[in-house]
Design a protein with these regions (language model features):
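Conserved SAM-binding loop
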Residues: 1-26, 38-53, 73, 134-136, ...
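Generic beta-strand/beta-sheet core signal
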Residues: 14-17, 58, 127-129
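Short, contiguous acidic/charged loop-to-helix segments that flank catalytic cores in large enzymes
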Residues: 32-36, 102
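Conserved S-adenosyl-L-methionine
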Residues: 53-63
Length: 178
């Protein structure tokens, strides 16, 4: 346990992504992060308490894509509540998670149908050869619809995506391909 690494005057600073917005917005690329846990502010703070850590200060910073929760904590001899949170107190989190999981197949079909329709109009280029693109291509099984993966990072150009064996091109290729 982390609280055993500190004396009673020591502090730990945690900074974690707030998964709430991503779940509510059906962002299915979120699991690429491979965290063991995906927290809302409430579940994060409860987890700290259950692990014998007292919150000195906390805040949430809102960003356009993913919000960040941070907390400065210190060891506590008193754990406010050793019991798990009652399910009834997590209605919002559970409802959001259920919708997130139930909507995936619908969203996947919508994405595939969109790419199938657009592919008939001509080649498709995906901008960005990062983890989000890999997740997007993989989770929605759309590699067969992607003709070009473009990225301005010179260290990526000429390499291949780990999904679909798609070569990564400099965005300038669009000028040549018209």
């Amino acid at each position: 346990k982390l609280n055993q690494l500190l004396n009673l005057n020591g502090c730990i600073v945690f900074e974690i992504p707030d998964s709430s917005k991503l779940v509510r917005n059906y962002d299915y690329t979120m699991p690429w992060e491979e965290h063991l846990y995906y927290y809302s502010p409430r579940t994060f703070f409860e987890s700290l308490n259950k692990n014998g850590l007292s919150i000195i200060f906390s805040n949430k910073i809102n960003y356009s894509y993913e919000d960040v929760i941070y907390a400065i904590v210190k060891p506590s001899k008193i754990i406010k509540n050793k019991n798990l949170l009652p399910v009834s107190t997590l209605k919002k989190e559970l409802s959001d998670a259920k919708k997130y999981s139930m909507y995936f197949e619908i969203k996947k079909k919508m994405v595939k149908d969109f790419f199938k329709k657009e592919r008939k109009k001509g080649p498709i280029a995906l901008f960005g050869a990062g983890h989000m693109s890999v997740s997007f291509i993989s989770f929605f099984n759309i590699s067969s619809y992607i003709d070009y993966v473009l990225d301005g990072n010179k260290n990526k150009i000429g390499l291949y995506m780990p999904i679909g064996n798609k070569k990564i091109y400099n965005p300038d290729i669009l000028k040549m391909k018209n």
